[in-house]
Amino acid sequence: REGATALMQQYDQRRLRLFAVVLFLGIMAANLGRYLIFDGLYLWDARLRWQECAYVLHGLNPFDVMHSRVPSIESIGWLDASLGGTVPWAYVLGNVINPGFLPYSAMCVYILALDFIAPLVTALCMGRFLLRHRYVQDKYMAVLASLLVFAPSMWANAVLFGNQSGIVCCCVILSMCVLEDSETLAGLLLAVAMCKPQVAFVFLFPLLCKKHWKAI
């Protein structure tokens, strides 16, 4: 009887953890749905970053286009100097997130897909990382913890505006998860994340202290 009781308690705990995971996903989906219904899909940031990358691929300095030193390209559009501008290397690395070689409509589909695929891949890798290093013992808790990449409400805003922040954060998390297996891959992911150095730069210091030279 005691064994049966213990099994039932364990079963109930698993059901509770599974319910927590499903509830968490439901809250995140509802939050995104609320923004979509009441605010709509803007993708303003995505368009701006795409324009900058596209001009660079056409051999033009986006800052020259912004300040009307060179004429804009009709198929790309004019750049607003009050909104545009980022770190110089992001005009090249940014093509991974906002590919300037694609038409704008195709880029919109691409970044929306990336906004969902990147967190899912990150959650999978993070869950495996947590289990492998025994930060958690239960797979349901590992799933719940890894799904925290969807937790900030700003993730929904990043989707609506096509902002790079959510994808950049995923790159940072992935780089830390794969560091032990491949410093080169970790470094490449961190390089893409440097499109937003205010997010990624701080992670170079622990890599430096741990002497992960390849990643740096």
PLM-predicted stretches and their roles:
Residues 130, 139-155:
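Transmembrane and membrane-interface helices of multi-pass
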Residues 121-141, 180-181:
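Transmembrane alpha-helical segments of multipass membrane enzymes and assembly factors
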Residues 113-118, 166-171, 196-200:
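Membrane-embedded alpha-helical segments of multi-pass membrane proteins
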Residues 135, 165-167, 172-185:
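Membrane-interface transmembrane helices that cradle and orient dolichyl/undecaprenyl
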Residues 7-9, 201-216:
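Perimembrane helix-loop-helix junctions
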